[in-house]
Amino acid sequence: MKIVKISPRGYCYGVVDAMVIARNAALDTSLPRPIYILGMIVHNKHVTDAFEEDGIITLDGPSRLDILDKIDSGTVIFTAHGVSPEVKQRAKEKGLTTIDATCPDVTKTHDLIEAKKAEGYHVIYIGKKNHPEPEGAVGIAPDIVHLIEKADDLKTLEIPTDKILVTNQTTMSQWDVQHLMEDIQKKFPTAEFHKEICLATQVRQEAVAKQADVADLTIVVGDPKSNNSNRLAQVSQEIAGTKAYRVADVSEIKLEWLQGVENVAVTAGASTPTPITKEVIAFLEQYDPMNPATWERVRKVPLQKILPRVKVKKEQ
């Protein structure tokens, strides 16, 4: 079996930065305890499990405000997906120490929404409902930001001005966003468009589109909650024309997927730890359909190998 290692794949700079911020927090003895992450720091359970070993508690809930209600003291880390001003204000009112790990690309979108609100615009925001990134973006100006996920959402959308900006969640499929923007332009011809697919998402999607077409199967390594991982599987199927499965790690690979397969493409979401992806590739490289000894699929990567290393500051 030949393995097509799609490149680039895996961690983006925003994810690495967020994890380094959280690791430094875990090592900072001056921070009030306990230390909480408001939702998953990045959408990967292996990462959140590793942080739990570091003493950092990941809390989840329907919204960031709902999660904050569970916290009465300590330190709160805002995730890479960003949060609304209301969440920041609520944390301040509760007397919590806050650390912001928002991805710079997400911050750019927040700044854009604020600037356009000041100019009297309404904003159409393309994103996934119930995902934390759109929650934070809509929360910048909930009175003028309209969240849409698919073309059907446009049918009932009415906006009381011709001053309209269209932007999007950074981890969406660039093809889906383009198609939706074309539909929006037909309904709102005066709209201005500001596509905000982050560069890391874009190049990873384009790599799958260009490199997965030679494979019989694509395996995307990524958490089920990771929107960018799910979009990579979608790109493989819809753009490259190659059947795709998303797995959290090697243990989720089903042997029947590999029957009759000669070429397997492998990629990984932007929040997927590199050792987890390497373990998937190693399994596929040694797999022999005629040798049951090669069929074992057990994740063996220790949690301490998941998180990036950080330098411990020496006391003066």
From Swiss-Prot:
InterPro entries: LytB/IspH. The active site is at 133 (proton donor). This is 4-hydroxy-3-methylbut-2-enyl diphosphate reductase. (2E)-4-hydroxy-3-methylbut-2-enyl diphosphate binds at residues 43, 81, 131, 170, 226, 228, 271. Dimethylallyl diphosphate binds at residues 43, 81, 131, 226, 228, 271. CDD domains: lytB_ispH (cd13944). Its EC number is 1.17.7.4. Pathway: Isoprenoid biosynthesis; dimethylallyl diphosphate biosynthesis; dimethylallyl diphosphate from (2E)-4-hydroxy-3-methylbutenyl diphosphate: step 1/1; Isoprenoid biosynthesis; isopentenyl diphosphate biosynthesis via DXP pathway; isopentenyl diphosphate from 1-deoxy-D-xylulose 5-phosphate: step 6/6. The gene is ispH. GO terms for molecular function: 4 iron, 4 sulfur cluster binding; 4-hydroxy-3-methylbut-2-enyl diphosphate reductase activity; metal ion binding.
